[in-house]
Each structure stands twice: as structure tokens, then as C-alpha cells.
């Protein structure tokens, strides 16, 4: 822990991993009431480009080592209609993400609505406990300079 407090400043949007970084600071400030904060959740998007490649005359050939029986299994299972393996992986990432936010904002979170992936306007994020203050950057700097006695 630093003897000097760290400040995470959200300039219009602090979402997902960007919010996760800001949440590690001692104080989290958003620049205005319409700044968006949150999007705490995980997902994976997969694209099947097989048909597009075939239309271009490209044939994909994959050769795996005999021992690599699980290599890319969750991906191919999901592409073939069974996302359960990929879902387990995404859920594990999500659990770790939520645990980080809980630890970073310990004692400041007022409810669990932040865990759903929702984006909040700053005034709502303040009520939930995702941020500590709402003020413009120039005001934050002015206050810091005043505290540090810098003109």
C-alpha cells in the first residue's frame, strides 16, 4: 500500500477491464454524471469462418500431435453446438473478475447489481459503490495541487 493515495479517473467510460484497473485505486472518480461505469462480466464470442474461407477457395487443414487430444476442444465443441466446456471457462474467468472487484472495493459496495455486466451512469455507480466521487478532471487536479501545495 502506497502512503500516497492512488486515484483512478474515469473519463466518460470505465468499463470491464478498464474499470477493473481503476477499482484497484484507493479512490475512483468519474468525470460527470453521464460517464458510464461497470460492465463487470465476461463473455466469449466465436466466429465460424469456414464457409467464408471455402467461398474464397481456402481449405483449412489442422494437424495435432497425438498427445494433444484436448487442444482447442472447448472451442470446437462450442462451434458444433455444445458450449458447456467454454461456458465453464468463461464462468471461471468471471468468478475471478468479480473476486478482484470485491477485493478492490472492499467495504464500499452497497449491493450486488454490479455483478451482472450492467453499465451504470456515474450517479448510479456512486450509489452502488463502484466509484467514490463525480467531478471534472481539472477540479481533481486543482484539489491535488492544493493538497501538495503546488501552484
Which residues fall in each region the model found?
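Hydrophobic residues within well-ordered alpha-helices
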Residues: 22, 125-126
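Small-residue-centered hinge/linker elements
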Residues: 1-4, 13-104, 147
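Short, well-structured beta-strand/strand-turn elements
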Residues: 26-32, 129-140
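C-terminal long alpha-helix characteristic of the crotonase
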Residues: 87-112, 122-123, 132-151
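Short linear loop/turn motifs
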Residues: 65-71, 115-118, 138-143
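A generic structural-conservation signal
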Residues: 8, 62, 134-135
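Glycine-rich beta-to-alpha transition loops that act as phosphate-gripper elements at the mouths
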Residues: 9-15, 114-118
Amino acid at each position: 500500500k502506497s502512503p500516497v493515495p492512488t486515484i483512478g479517473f474515469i473519463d466518460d467510460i470505465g468499463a470491464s477491464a478498464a474499470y477493473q484497473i481503476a477499482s484497484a485505486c484507493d479512490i475512483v472518480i468519474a468525470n460527470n454524471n453521464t460517464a458510464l461505469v461497470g460492465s463487470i462480466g465476461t463473455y466469449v464470442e466465436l466466429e465460424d469462418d469456414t464457409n467464408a474461407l471455402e467461398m474464397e477457395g481456402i481449405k483449412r487443414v489442422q494437424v495435432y500431435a497425438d498427445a494433444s487430444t484436448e487442444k482447442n476442444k472447448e472451442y470446437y465443441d462450442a462451434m458444433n453446438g455444445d458450449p458447456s466446456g467454454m461456458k465453464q471457462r468463461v464462468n471461471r474467468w468471471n468468478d475471478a473478475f468479480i473476486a478482484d472487484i470485491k477485493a478492490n472495493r472492499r467495504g464500499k459496495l452497497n449491493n450486488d447489481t454490479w455483478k451482472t455486466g450492467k453499465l451504470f451512469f456515474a450517479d448510479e455507480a456512486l450509489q452502488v459503490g463502484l466509484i467514490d466521487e463525480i467531478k471534472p478532471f481539472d477540479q481533481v487536479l486543482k484539489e491535488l495541487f492544493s493538497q501538495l501545495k503546488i501552484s
